[in-house]
Amino acid sequence: MQRITITLDDDLLETLDSLSQRRGYNNRSEAIRDILRSALAQEATQQHGTQGFAVLSYVYEHEKRDLASRIVSTQHHHHDLSVATLHVHINHDDCLEIAVLKGDMGDVQHFADDVIAQRGVRHGHLQCLPKED
């Protein structure tokens, strides 16, 4: 491990210290390492051809015209990416789905875009993790 020196604006340093405290980091170095790892992982997952894992979460109205069947159709069309799906009934109208995906990150992003773009899908979020060798 190497020791480096960085220069930060006062406002940015305040934000870093606040983040470190909220997340329970013992020091700034740990927080900066995690932030950097997260940024590098995100960049790696945006490269087509990169293999990895992802979690796609979204809320949808199950009574919306044919929405549930369109989502299922999209899932079946990309069956090779799906590892598991959790379905939660939030209330009478809304469902939360959490899909664990595995494969080429470009294909995973395409699948997520297909689902999130469906009319009636809200709060779509894709969290990607590159496969570590």
Curated annotation (Swiss-Prot):
User: InterPro entries of this UniProt entry?
Assistant: Acetolactate_synth/TF_NikR_C, ACT-like_dom_sf, Arc_rbn_hlx_hlx, CopG, CopG/NikR_regulator, Ni_resp_reg_NikR, Nickel_NikR_proteobac, Ribbon_hlx_hlx
User: What NCBIfam families does the database record attribute to this sequence?
Assistant: nikR, PRK02967.1, PRK04460.1
Gene that produces this protein: nikR
Name the positions where Ni(2+) binds. 76, 87, 89, 95
SUPFAM superfamilies the record matches: ACT-like, Ribbon-helix-helix
Its subunit composition reads: Homotetramer.
Key words of the record: DNA-binding, Metal-binding, Nickel, Repressor, Transcription, Transcription regulation
Q: Which GO terms describe its biological process?
A: response to nickel cation
Covalent S-S links between cysteines: none
State which residue ranges cross the membrane: none
Q: Does the keyword Magnesium apply?
A: no
- Record protein name field: Nickel-responsive regulator
The coenzyme or cofactor needed here is: Ni(2+)
Question: Does this UniProt record's set of keywords contain DNA-binding?
Answer: yes
